[in-house]
From Swiss-Prot:
UniProt subcellular location: Secreted
Positions of modified residues (Tyrosine amide): Y36
Alphabetized UniProt keyword annotations: Amidation, Hormone, Secreted
Protein name, as recorded: Pancreatic polypeptide
Gene Ontology cellular component terms for the protein in this record: extracellular space
Organism classification: Eukaryota, Metazoa, Chordata, Craniata, Vertebrata
Pfam families the UniProt entry points to: Hormone_3
Gene Ontology biological process terms in this record: feeding behavior; neuropeptide signaling pathway
GO molecular function: neuropeptide hormone activity; neuropeptide Y receptor binding
Gene3D superfamilies: 6.10.250.900
Length: 36
């Protein structure tokens, strides 16, 4: 399966945080889709 995105850190730029949460949402969608 896909690799889980790594949290960029609290001091990361906002763009990195936004990208992380976007990737995390896609990751969770893929993971939950394959689980059922």
């Amino acid at each position: 399966g896909p690799a889980q995105p790594t949290y960029p850190g609290d001091d990361a730029p906002v763009e990195d945080l936004v990208r992380f949460y976007d990737n995390l949402q896609q990751y969770l969608n893929v993971v939950t889709r394959h689980r059922y």
